[in-house]
UniProtKB/Swiss-Prot annotation:
Name the UniProt record assigns to this protein: Small ribosomal subunit protein uS9
Record carries keyword Ion transport: no
Gene from which this protein is expressed: rps9
Range of residues in the leader sequence: none
Alphabetized UniProt keyword annotations: Ribonucleoprotein, Ribosomal protein
Amino acid sequence: MDYVITTGKRKTAVARAVVKKGKGIITINGTPAELYPVEVLRNKILEPVKLAEDKAKGIDVTVKVKGGGVTGQADASRTAIARGIVKFLQDNELENLFRQYDRTLIVNDVRIKLPKKPGGRGARAKKQKSYR
C-alpha cells in the first residue's frame, strides 16, 4: 500500500490526512505539528503518534484541515491521524488500544452546535415578556 487517505470531523472542522511511508514527519496545513501554536492542542494532535510508539516511527502524515475553530480543527486532525495510522498499518490491536484510550480517536464526535431559533438570541434563550 503506497498511501492512505482518511478523514476526521469535529463540529464544523473537517480534516483530511494522507499517510505514507517516510521519516515520521507530521504536518498540519503545511507546518510541522511540533510548531503548532497552542501546546495543549499540539499534545492532543500528537496523542495517536505517542500511543502508537514504534509502530508510527516510519510514517509521514500530511493533514489539511478546514472550517471550525482551533480546538475543533485539532480534534478533527487527531481523529484523521489515528484513523490513518490504523488503516495504513492494518493493525486491529492498535485500533482497540485507541478505542480504549479515547473513543473519539477512531469515531467522529458528532455533537454540533444547536441552531438558533426565532424569538430569541440563541438556540434556547427567548425574549422576555412583561405581561404589564
